[in-house]
Amino acid sequence: MSYTQAFLRNFLGTSPNWYKITIVLFLIINPIIFFFISPFIAGWLLVAEFILTLAMALKCYPLQPGGLLALEAVAIGMTHPEHVKAEIIANFEVILLLIFMVAGIYFMKRLLLFVFTKLLLSIRSKMVLSLAFCLSAAFLSAFLDALTVVAVIISVGMGFYGVYHKVASGNNFNDSTDITKDDKIGENKDTLEQFRAFLRSLMMHSCVGTALGGVMTMVGEPQNLIIAEQAKWAFGEFFLRMLPVTLPVLICGLVTCFLVEKFGVFGYGAKLPRKVWGILAKFDRNNQQKMSQQDRLKLFVQALIGIWLVVGLAFHLAAVGIIGLTVIILATSFCGVTSEHAIGKAFQESLPFTALLVVFFSVVAVIIDQHLFAPIIQFVLAASEHTQLALFYIFNGLLSAISDNVFVATVYINETKAALEAGLIAQPQYELLAVAINTGTNLPSVATPNGQAAFLFLLTSSLAPLIRLSYGRMVYMALPYTIVLSCIGLLAVEYILPGATNVLIQIGLLKPM
């Protein structure tokens, strides 16, 4: 093997060769266009390239190719290190949220696992169970990180799939078997396929639930906190500002959940086979019998910490990330987790995305320095105030469906804040636009795994291939939710939001600026 071949193999690892070559071409072309053609065109090309790296997340995590593009952008002068640093400091609370809150919830997984297991085994109606999973995921995602909620539900699904697969293969609960191979299933194959379809539908309902709940509060999604910081909204005000849009969307989302299960469309409707339920119930009883006093006390402690988390966030007793740090300290102290290695595992989930977020901010700095979004913002602001809301929602929604919604929200809220400071829009209109940006980035982004981190997390999990959940199938199953959430969100932003906000101000729940 030559050094050239070795270099190509090392560069971006197992990514497709065409993708590696494409990234190298981008790195060659960008400086040429920046210096000899137009910095504006080079800036837009960088944004398009960065969106491509996000869309290719299944082939290669965007941190590496996106990071290389951002590094080059800083090196050739498209932005400056000081501006990147300023963007990071301005959004430091989001970084704290990702580092500490996600890690804190990791230590509450046992409680969440217990809750979802009980839901799965105690509710026999598939429609009620689907609504319960969707609502539970929505409620938890309003206070916790959506990735962690999905991770817990994946753990439940993975555990139950493994239990049934072992028994169907002729083994016992505790036997070590390869659950990726079906060669020993035999006559239970049809039951296994039905169980896979059942788990697929529950996973999708849960993921959509995280989007329904995540849009409602300032801690539900990372971009929410960015918007809340720019608009100077506390937890309660953010919730009330979003309510005219998020409440109708939540209701219609739950109705959609009920209808797709009732009529068995878009891949939904599969029920839990009775044989599988019997095996899972027996497995759960065995686990309950093995549970010690120490284990029960840990669940109780985690429940108390959960109450503290909700109270701390609701009354904004500290920065979100700091509350997450208190969760880590309390959960590890009272549950006996004292090993540095055990604590370190909690941070594995969030730190890659935290690093990627810093790369986002580098691209945002380029967008600001090169005035890339100025024509779009000017076009939107030239419209009437009533039309501006719909246009912001639509532009955010389209971009969020193919790109990461944190990136999209950061760009748009920064540009809108600049328009406010330049006197192009008034404060009340700015606040309505902030709601349109938040809902526009959160709701239509359920269309593809590229937009919602929780969807991407499920797609890249070890459970997805086991239950035959591919990219195409996920998009297809998300389609009814995409249509309903996007359309209801748009109608609410255009026709309900302005009037409802005025009513909330008049009755004293919101303060006029």
UniProtKB/Swiss-Prot annotation:
Disulfide bonds: none annotated. One of its GO terms (cellular component) is plasma membrane. It is found in: Cell inner membrane. Coiled coil: none annotated. It catalyses: 2 Na(+)(in) + 3 H(+)(out) = 2 Na(+)(out) + 3 H(+)(in). The chain crosses the membrane at residues 21-41, 88-108, 119-139, 143-163, 208-228, 247-267, 303-323, 357-377, 389-409, 447-467, 477-497. GO terms for molecular function: sodium:proton antiporter activity. It is a multi-pass membrane protein. Na(+)/H(+) antiporter that extrudes sodium in exchange for external protons. PANTHER family: NA(+)_H(+) ANTIPORTER NHAB, TRANSPORTER ARSB-RELATED. Belongs to the NhaB Na(+)/H(+) (TC 2.A.34) antiporter family. This is Na(+)/H(+) antiporter NhaB. The lineage of its organism: Bacteria, Pseudomonadati, Pseudomonadota, Gammaproteobacteria, Pasteurellales.
